[in-house]
């Protein structure tokens, strides 16, 4: 996000889109290792082959401890990335006092922008959830999914939903998909279904086809021709 805004300011141009990419667990070592591997692919060259984003005009470092732990988890890290505030491990965009913290995505929506949240894992996973939900525990998957409708963003996409009809305290609950539809969302299962429905849809939720693992998209090495991909999700969001 910072990179896009600074580049626009430097060039005096108006940005059509702002993309905020998060590599979950992707630290300096992972990036450097990838650049070394890219160089190795070039006839065994020693050194690094820079990735596109490491050549952006601005880069910075961030601390990775949470408010309560030396090692953060995805929930506290996602909250920090979404709100700029540190919180306790397992928190989804709430502070240590359990009160909600407004996210950058919510600010964009209030400013009249269209907003989408996409992921390669489940839509109710801690990292994407931190941008639209406010819950005391990352495992409150059903409650997080309900918050999706409250945020009222324009597009959500990912593997699926982990607990579509079971609350955090393991009680039966109304299935989440009719709730989505009542809130004005068109649910598409798979890329073909998305293409068939998107022309007549307003707000949309794109997930994998029925029967596929909702926890994440298939890894590239295991991917079948009809599996939903992150590239398709990104194209759909745009």
Language model feature labels by segment:
Residues 3-11:
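Hydrophobic h-region of N-terminal signal peptides that target proteins for export
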Residues 210-217, 222-224:
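Membrane-embedded hairpin module used as a gating/binding unit in multi-pass transport
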Residues 220-238:
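Accessory "access/gating" subregions that flank catalytic or transport cores
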